[in-house]
C-alpha cells in the first residue's frame, strides 16, 4: 500500500515544450496544484530557458 505522502505529493516529470526532452523530475502537491504544472527551466538540449510542462 502506498504511503500517505506519496499520494499527496507524487513524482512528476517535466518535459521541454520545444524539443520534448524530459529533463527534470520533481514532486508537486495535488491539493494546491490539481492542473498540470508548467515552469520556466533551462533545457540543455535547446541551450535556452524554455517552458517545461508536466507529463503523464
From Swiss-Prot:
SUPFAM superfamilies linked to this entry: Zn-binding ribosomal proteins
InterPro entries: Ribosomal_bL33 (IPR001705), Ribosomal_bL33_CS (IPR018264), Ribosomal_bL33_sf (IPR038584), Ribosomal_zn-bd (IPR011332)
GO biological process: translation
UniProt keyword annotations, A-Z: Ribonucleoprotein, Ribosomal protein
Record PROSITE patterns: RIBOSOMAL_L33
Keyword Nuclease: no
Family the entry assigns: Belongs to the bacterial ribosomal protein bL33 family.
Name of this protein: Large ribosomal subunit protein bL33
Gene responsible for this protein: rpmG
